[in-house]
Curated annotation (Swiss-Prot):
One of its GO terms (biological process) is cytochrome complex assembly. InterPro entries: C-type_cytochrome_biogenesis, CcmH/CycL/Ccl2/NrfF_N, CcmH/CycL/NrfF/Ccl2_sf. Its main location: periplasm. The keyword Signal applies. Required for the biogenesis of c-type cytochromes. Possible subunit of a heme lyase. One of its GO terms (molecular function) is metal ion binding. Keywords: Cytochrome c-type biogenesis, Heme, Iron, Metal-binding, Periplasm, Signal. This is Cytochrome c-type biogenesis protein Ccl2. It comes from the Bacteria. Belongs to the CcmH/CycL/Ccl2/NrfF family. The keyword Nucleotidyltransferase does not apply. Gene3D superfamilies: Cytochrome C biogenesis protein.
Length: 149
C-alpha cells in the first residue's frame, strides 16, 4: 500500500523539461530564466510553456533565454528578442495595444451589449402585458350565481 502511494506521489509531481545541462550556475540568473520560460509559449505545442515542453524548439528557446541573460540582457530585452524571432504567438499574454486591444475589449463589450439587450427585452415585455379587466357589477352577480350552482 505504501509503495502504491509513493508511486502515485512520484507520478503526480510536475515534470519540468529543463535538462541538467541547461541549468545556469548562478541561481539568480537561473531563477530569472525559469520565470521568463514560464511566460513564453512553445511554438509547436498547444498551451505549453517552453519551461515544460520537451520539443526541440523549446530547448533551443530555453538556451537562447539563458544566453541572453548571461550576456546581460534584462528580462524585457530577452522576451523582446524571442518575440522578434517568433512573433507575438510565443507570448502567453499578448501585449495590450493595436489589434490586440480590440480583442481584449470585445468580450466585455459583447457581454455589456447582451445584458443591455436582455434588460430592454424584459422591460418591453412588462409593458406589453395587458391588465386583467375588472368585472362589472352585473358580471360579478352573474359569476356568483354560477358558482352557487
Amino acid at each position: 500500500m505504501l509503495k502504491r502511494l509513493l508511486l502515485l506521489l512520484v507520478l503526480a509531481t510536475p515534470v519540468h523539461a529543463v535538462q541538467p545541462d541547461e541549468v545556469l550556475s548562478d541561481p539568480g540568473l537561473e531563477a530569472r530564466a525559469r520565470q521568463i520560460s514560464q511566460v513564453l509559449r512553445c511554438p509547436v505545442c498547444q498551451g505549453e510553456n517552453i519551461d515544460e515542453s520537451n520539443a526541440g524548439v523549446s530547448r533551443d528557446l530555453r538556451l537562447a533565454v539563458r544566453e541572453r541573460l548571461v550576456a546581460g540582457d534584462s528580462d524585457a530585452q530577452v522576451i523582446d528578442y524571442i518575440k522578434d524571432r517568433f512573433g507575438e504567438y510565443v507570448l502567453f499574454e499578448p501585449e495590450r495595444r493595436g489589434a490586440n486591444l480590440i480583442l481584449y475589449w470585445i468580450g466585455p463589450a459583447v457581454l455589456v451589449v447582451a445584458l443591455g439587450g436582455i434588460f430592454l427585452w424584459l422591460r418591453g415585455r412588462r409593458r406589453e402585458e395587458e391588465p386583467v379587466p375588472v368585472l362589472s357589477a352585473e358580471e360579478e352577480a352573474r359569476l356568483k350565481d354560477l358558482l352557487k350552482d
